[in-house]
Amino acid sequence: MSITPQEALQRTIEHREIFHDEMLHLMRLIMRGELSPVMAAAIITGLRVKKETIGEITAAATVMREFARHVEVQDNSNFVDIVGTGGDGSHTFNISTATMFVSAAAGAKVAKHGGRSVSSKSGSADVLEALGVNIDLQPEQVAASIAETGMGFMFAPNHHPAMKNIAPVRRELGVRTIFNILGPLTNPAGAPNQLMGVFHADLVGIQVRVMQRLGAKHVLVVYGMDGMDEVSLGAATQVGELRDGQIHEYEIHPEDFGMQMVSNRTLKVADANESKAMLLEALDNKPGVAREIVTLNAGTALYSANVASSIADGIQLAREAIASGKARAKVDELARFTQQFKQ
């Protein structure tokens, strides 16, 4: 079913849904650069004001996946993506990147999909470069990295070239749009399991249902109720879990896992170098909030990857991976492996 851009805009003004096939058509126009910047800006702003529906987000994610440069991974077992929407304004060190190293050391395969800074002063790409990792890899090189090291980083601009058509519009608008929530839904390696942090409580139920429609296996969508797009130590965390096609929504607390509730204020950083220093402190097993929050998030990721049978079991595996030095060794392993592809 086709819809004109003008009809779509009128729908958003009237707070009416754009149906699945119509949204597929619209998104393809956007990704091919066939909508004028004015019309593209009007539609994505209209969707934001109306509030995007699960159906609209699912259709948009389907099209972004169509246009992506895919990473072919042979073995999907224990394969997980660890990602946040960003935009939570917390300015913390890069917790999800530290979580990747711990999870890989404990037996998961991690396909991390990310870019430069959104909410932190240092995005996953920024801190990985500071750690000596070459992020500018071709899809087949990322696949080799996952096979060899258990980790692969997919720098979003390399895998979503069609996004260049909407990037100037997004930059000029300067407000959140549907594209802020599409990134975590469009992992180019198609990881069936995911730990996804979101920037608003309302997104927990929405994103987990979108992942259900997209055919994901085991997903935990999390929102720290102190505002973090991570599992938080400073408050309860709202969780939407998809497993075996079923969705369960619940809350978890640090105390559930024998951890103390502490403020996340000490996790704030000013730039990629500070983020790197705090990440390495955590992986070097230095006692403190950084190590604890990485352990908590890695435990959750290991549960999502089906390496662990529960979050508590995952936390135990994460502690062992850090204490043994295996997690810290993963940093150097990824840096060494990716540098061979440097142009």
Curated annotation (Swiss-Prot):
Anthranilate 1 binds at residue 84. 5-phospho-alpha-D-ribose 1-diphosphate binds at residues 84, 87-88, 92, 94-97, 112-120, 124. Its EC number is 2.4.2.18. It comes from the Bacteria. Keywords: Amino-acid biosynthesis, Aromatic amino acid biosynthesis, Glycosyltransferase, Magnesium, Metal-binding, Transferase, Tryptophan biosynthesis. Binds 2 magnesium ions per monomer. It catalyses: N-(5-phospho-beta-D-ribosyl)anthranilate + diphosphate = 5-phospho-alpha-D-ribose 1-diphosphate + anthranilate. Mg(2+) 1 binds at residues 96, 230. It is an enzyme of class 2 (transferase). Pathway: Amino-acid biosynthesis; L-tryptophan biosynthesis; L-tryptophan from chorismate: step 2/5. Mg(2+) 2 binds at residues 229-230. GO terms for cellular component: cytosol. SUPFAM superfamilies: Nucleoside phosphorylase/phosphoribosyltransferase catalytic domain, Nucleoside phosphorylase/phosphoribosyltransferase N-terminal domain. Homodimer. HAMAP family: TrpD. Catalyzes the transfer of the phosphoribosyl group of 5-phosphorylribose-1-pyrophosphate (PRPP) to anthranilate to yield N-(5'-phosphoribosyl)-anthranilate (PRA). This is Anthranilate phosphoribosyltransferase.
